[in-house]
């Protein structure tokens, strides 16, 4: 049985936001998805929100503050360190992958370009969130 997830999507491209939202819609599961579109709004959003995400989807190329800096902030303090972060970006540069994984990202995924890719992404996100809930 699939579980509904609390997801924070940090993405500045409205078209990608729409694709992610469509992919995260499931006939049997209604995920709660919050969207933040600028890097400088992420931490204030998390601090003020009454809903704690079970997984964060983070683009690297964001306005105001780069995704790598956001990841560093999230993983350096106690408040949000335990929330799994999945990097979703067009970059596949080895330096970006290494930096993000060393900084505490759960997974680094190049943005899908088709519906099948987004469906696989939803499966990965669900597995990561469920693993963390079980103490993984």
Where do the language-model regions lie?
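Hydrophobic residue at a beta-alpha junction
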Residues: 62-65, 74
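C-terminal output helix
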Residues: 113-125
């Amino acid at each position: 049985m699939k579980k509904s997830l609390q997801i924070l999507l940090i993405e500045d491209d409205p078209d990608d936001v729409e694709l992610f939202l469509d992919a995260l819609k499931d006939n049997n599961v209604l995920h709660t998805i919050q969207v933040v579109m600028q890097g400088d709004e992420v931490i204030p959003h998390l601090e003020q929100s009454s809903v704690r995400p079970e997984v964060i989807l983070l683009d690297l190329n964001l306005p105001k503050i780069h995704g790598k800096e956001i990841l560093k902030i999230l993983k350096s303090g106690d408040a949000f360190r335990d929330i799994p972060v999945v990097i979703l970006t067009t970059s596949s540069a080895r330096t970006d992958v290494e930096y993000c994984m060393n900084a505490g990202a759960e997974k680094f995924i190049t943005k899908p370009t088709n519906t099948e890719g987004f469906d696989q992404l939803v499966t990965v996100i669900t597995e990561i969130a469920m693993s963390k809930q079980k103490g993984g």
